[in-house]
């Protein structure tokens, strides 16, 4: 080998110039201080431009303006529940939803504007997309509307919303009661706590469903419970358990709450509840009977018992 750079089909003087350039010449240029300074300047300029561009670009969410997001993917995770992936305007966008808050979803159905609230289950750093896990109910206007969407159809969204915003060290022991898709705000909080080493909050989650196949995000929940067994206690309750089931059976009871969740007299603790309305009503009654404070009609961050 001669060490000459092979050049084909380059016209005129440029070709003649490059024919006399060796690979060694190129290496010398690439290692020269001037070249390194120029390359560094280009990298810095690109980073600066990217930062300025991203900071001036509108955020995906606005609490006062409805925005449309196209459906990118649908993944059926149980007979009546699916994970819907929606596309953000730019590939580098993150949704920017504070931990514990939710979005509003709106649709015009039968001449009426219907609004419901959902907490995305996508991770905080997910770029270019967000995910909603939604159970379709026979009489659920919004859930049936979302289920009817085809890839490319848009969903009208506004946010963030909500009175709960998790910050590290909010409380020492967090007790959670979730039913079905009510897991959504809980999994966001669980992830935020366990994946932040300085946050030493202990968590107990009672998660209720009808059938075993209805347990959502089970692989992730089980992995977190195994990986953080000293800080994350996970207890499943099933209404229709399979043979050999070792978890709770039936509904979440006062006994489950007394045995697993923080004591009502434990000062540095909170109880969070999210699930279908009948379940929430039953849990409020159970908590009241074992001397937890009665939840407010509209929960606030400093409440002992917070209902999403």
Curated annotation (Swiss-Prot):
Main localisation: mitochondrion
Family indicated by similarity: Belongs to the flavoprotein pyridine nucleotide cytochrome reductase family.
Superkingdom assignment: Eukaryota
Species, as recorded: Laccaria bicolor (strain S238N-H82 / ATCC MYA-4686)
Protein name: NADH-cytochrome b5 reductase 1
GO molecular function, one term: cytochrome-b5 reductase activity, acting on NAD(P)H
Binding of FAD, residues: 147-162, 173-205
Function: NADH-dependent reductase for DPH3 and cytochrome b5. Required for the first step of diphthamide biosynthesis, a post-translational modification of histidine which occurs in elongation factor 2. DPH1 and DPH2 transfer a 3-amino-3-carboxypropyl (ACP) group from S-adenosyl-L-methionine (SAM) to a histidine residue, the reaction is assisted by a reduction system comprising DPH3 and a NADH-dependent reductase, predominantly MCR1.1.
Name of the gene: MCR1.1
Biological process, per Gene Ontology: protein histidyl modification to diphthamide; tRNA wobble base 5-methoxycarbonylmethyl-2-thiouridinylation
Record note on quaternary structure: Monomer. Component of the 2-(3-amino-3-carboxypropyl)histidine synthase complex composed of DPH1, DPH2, DPH3 and a NADH-dependent reductase, predominantly MCR1.1.
Transmembrane segments: 29-49
PANTHER family assigned: NADH-CYTOCHROME B5 REDUCTASE, NADH-CYTOCHROME B5 REDUCTASE-LIKE
